[in-house]
């Protein structure tokens, strides 16, 4: 499958399909072992699986460093939450579930292995739920949370009552998972640790392919091979042909395109993007299906919706049912989620943490025809290092860029500040860049930049969103103290290459 050319891995053609899971993967849940303990239960993927098991009647407990909204939702179901990684949760010899975020030295995981307990990787547990029923798996570097949520919402509207395991929070089902009585399971499929290759969907979806996890993949070729295997294991593969890596390297059964790709069975034409909605004609194999209107903005969300259309039609749904459901879809938490408005400034939380995602989000924001203030927290030092130049050039659609220190996600920080170096590099392409050297200072500093009418977009997959409420309060207090006016004077303390390193007490121009 892998050819070596000039000392580098080259991507071979996609192999033939093998859509049935091998016997060694046939390990469904054992009702005679009814207890499960999740190490790191607060994570979005782990909490979704814990929710499904708890709703099925299994006895579930879990541990994590700190409680959050997901653990509190589980506690309301009767799940026992243990703060900290003690051995308390191993009493009674439960089956133990862990994710790739849990290191082998974790005391709970190490003790479970020493005791000979049944231990599941999160992906294997998902596979046990997923591979033995009609399933739809949504994979891709970007857009998989929104696309899987759209498909789930569509099937709910059609009365199919699906089970859903999603990587984001949806108000429609109050969380990141729901247990339905219908036969279909819709799951978001994670490629970050390569575990997508453990799943064998009836319908596999691939939204796009890029390098996003250099902590796991050495290069793009390795990423492509993982997606090739996932596509090979899908009975029917639905994929976006606008992505060159998809169109070139995958054997796609059902393609979709916004750009008129000639091999795409599903196409969006006569596309109109406005500040309120996105609309397009949807064509199926050369015939007009009808008009699609979305509340969620931007070309990336239209592409996500077109994937949902293709899946719905493959399942036999009428286009009118699909279009009605997608017209009602209001998005996923942390995906261009409006957190509130203060003094004419709209505060938005968005999970974008890859250059392509940032570009797509900021393009959608520009449709509002308002000044865009982008606040970005890099996520993982390895990602920032690998994609540094792409990050430096991805903020063109923001009028002001504010960068804060990198969220390491457990990675060791490099010497010096990689986020400050990013700010310096962004300033080579952008006239208005600010750097805040300490995240807790952000609510004290950002209000001095904001103006009535702004869109303040907080971008990142780390803990930046935890500063939004405090920033809104600080901006409200600032408005109460004095009218907000443009500051036209000299900026104190100019730093290298036009970057302002902002202290908490400074009032700066926008």
From Swiss-Prot:
Its protein name is UDP-N-acetylmuramate--L-alanine ligase
UniProt cross-references to Pfam families, sorted A to Z: Mur_ligase, Mur_ligase_C, Mur_ligase_M
- EC number in record: 6.3.2.8
Q: Which residues bind ATP?
A: 140-146
The free-text function statement in the UniProt record for this protein reads:
Cell wall formation.
Q: InterPro entries recorded for this chain?
A: Mur-like_cat_sf, Mur_ligase_C, Mur_ligase_C_dom_sf, Mur_ligase_cen, Mur_ligase_N, MurCDEF_pg_biosynth, UDP-N-AcMur_Ala_ligase_MurC
Which pathway does this chain act in?
Cell wall biogenesis; peptidoglycan biosynthesis
Gene name of this polypeptide: murC
Region named Disordered? 1-25
Keyword Cell wall biogenesis/degradation attributed:
yes
Q: Which domain of life is it from?
A: Bacteria
Catalytic reactions on record: UDP-N-acetyl-alpha-D-muramate + L-alanine + ATP = UDP-N-acetyl-alpha-D-muramoyl-L-alanine + ADP + phosphate + H(+)
Give the family from UniProt.
Belongs to the MurCDEF family.
Organism whose genome encodes this protein: Synechococcus sp. (strain JA-3-3Ab) (Cyanobacteria bacterium Yellowstone A-Prime)
């Amino acid at each position: 499958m892998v050819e070596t050319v000039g000392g580098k891995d080259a991507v071979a053609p996609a192999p033939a399909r093998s859509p049935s899971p091998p016997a060694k993967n046939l390990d469904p849940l054992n009702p005679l072992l009814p207890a499960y303990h999740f190490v790191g239960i607060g994570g979005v993927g782990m909490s979704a699986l814990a929710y499904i098991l708890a709703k099925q009647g299994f006895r579930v407990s879990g541990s994590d460093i700190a409680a959050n909204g997901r653990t509190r939702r589980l506690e309301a179901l009767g799940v026992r939450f243990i703060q900290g990684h003690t051995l308390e949760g191993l009493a009674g010899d439960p089956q133990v579930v862990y994710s790739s975020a849990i290191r082998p030295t974790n005391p709970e995981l190490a003790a479970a292995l020493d005791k000979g307990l049944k231990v599941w990787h999160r992906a294997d547990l998902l596979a046990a739920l997923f591979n033995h029923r009609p399933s739809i798996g949504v994979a891709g570097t970007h857009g998989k949370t929104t696309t899987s949520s759209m498909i789930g919402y569509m099937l709910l509207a059609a009365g199919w009552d699906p089970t859903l395991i999603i990587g984001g929070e949806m108000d429609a089902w109050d969380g990141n998972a729901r247990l339905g009585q219908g036969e279909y399971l819709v799951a978001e499929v994670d490629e970050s640790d390569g575990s997508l290759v453990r799943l064998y969907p009836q319908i596999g979806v691939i939204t796009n392919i890029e390098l996003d996890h250099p902590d796991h993949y050495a290069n793009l070729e390795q990423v492509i091979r993982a997606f090739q295997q996932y596509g090979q294991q899908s009975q029917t593969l639905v994929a976006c042909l606008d992505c060159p890596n998809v169109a070139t390297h995958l054997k796609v059964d059902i393609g979709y395109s916004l750009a008129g790709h000639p091999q795409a069975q599903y196409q969006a034409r006569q596309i109109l993007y406005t500040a309120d909605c996105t609309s397009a004609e949807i064509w199926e194999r050369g015939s007009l299906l009808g008009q699609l209107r979305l509340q969620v903005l931007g070309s990336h969300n239209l592409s996500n919706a077109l994937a949902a259309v293709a899946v719905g039609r493959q399942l036999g749904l009428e286009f009118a049912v699909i279009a009605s459901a997608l017209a009602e879809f209001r998005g996923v938490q942390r995906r261009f989620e409006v957190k509130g408005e203060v003094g004419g400034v709209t505060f938005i939380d968005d999970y974008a943490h890859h250059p392509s995602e940032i570009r797509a989000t900021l393009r959608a924001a520009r449709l509002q025809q308002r000044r865009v203030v982008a606040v970005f927290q890099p996520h993982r030092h390895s990602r920032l290092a690998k994609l540094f130049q792409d990050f430096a050039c991805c903020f063109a659609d923001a009028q002001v860029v504010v960068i804060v220190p990198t969220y390491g996600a457990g990675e060791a920080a490099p010497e010096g500040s990689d986020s400050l170096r990013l700010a310096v590099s962004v300033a080579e392409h952008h006239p208005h860049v600010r750097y805040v050297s300490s995240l807790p200072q952000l609510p004290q500093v950002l209000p001095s930049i904001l103006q009535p009418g702004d869109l303040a977009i907080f971008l990142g997959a780390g803990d930046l969103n935890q500063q939004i409420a405090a920033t809104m309060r600080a901006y409200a207090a600032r408005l109460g103290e004095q009218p907000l006016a443009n500051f036209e004077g000299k900026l104190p303390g100019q730093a290298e290459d036009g970057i302002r390193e902002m202290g908490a007490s400074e009032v700066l121009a926008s």
